[in-house]
Amino acid sequence: LKAAKYLQDAGYDMLNADNGTYDSWYWAHPPVYMPLNCNMAEVTRLKEVVEIPVVCAGRMQPDEASASISEGKLDAMGIGRQFLADPEYIVKLEQEKFSDILPCIACHNACLPIYHYEGVGCEIDEEDGKTQGHCALNPRTFCEQKYDFEKKAAVTKSIAVIGGGIAGMTVARIAAIRGHEVTI
């Protein structure tokens, strides 16, 4: 709390806060085993000591964030990985299309390769892409220019997809967008 007051007095315009540090990085971007809204209780305490806006991140759920904002405990909800999974997240919230949201599952399997865990961002190898972040649920993430996912097929086919898990549904969706007849 003293640090928050110090930063405000030093001229900071906003605090985007979580419980993470270099040694406890998982609090900054909580994995699946961390509870939803896991930083909320501590971050809302900042509003008691500062007058600048306070933003909370870390698997924030819109209903809980909205309640905290309405109560004056927060000024905004921080969103990061959720945009990798579903870039239209905010639009879908505004339009109340909750069942259309592709939720981040906090798996860390694809989005975190953009970090080396050495305290610096990595150099992205455009040719290889092995160090480039992706999303386990959204194959378009960071590949929008590399692959044309919506390009119509020159020859349409009947495609059978065996399995309706995440991968099967993604394959079926992309194949249908490309004009193929898909059976799951």
Where are these regions (language model features)?
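Flavin-dependent oxidoreductase catalytic cores
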Residues: 1-162, 166-182
